[in-house]
Amino acid sequence: MPLQPSVQRWTWVALATALWFAPALSAQAGNFSAHLTAAPASYQGICPGTIKFSGEIRATQPGKVQFQYIRSDGAPSPVQTLLFGSAGSKPLSTTWTLGSPSLPRYTGWIAIQFVHPQTDRSKPANFNILCTIRPR
């Protein structure tokens, strides 16, 4: 059954609009990427222990990006802003100190959550902590 002329016309208008804006939307969605690594990825020792996370945000063109760290325990972090005058990368770092007699073992992660202009996230930087008893 053929479509009515008015339906065909609106279908073509919608398709043309989508094709017109698709390059701008895809370029904006992929301007930034991030990665983090945990050091040490596996901690065993006297607690509390500190895990250091380092990495970078990479831009494919000039622009502003807003992001925050997200953690496996759900603790919030403030939104941060980086300005890129040109394509390139900027270093990132944060720490997480944890482990106690009430939490002697923990497996977790931290990732970068982009807030603006895109909303994707990095792969998580995984780690684990195993507290040992302090020698007397």
Which ranges hold each PLM region?
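Bacterial N-terminal signal peptides that target proteins for export
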Residues: 2-14
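Bacterial N-terminal signal peptides
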Residues: 12-22
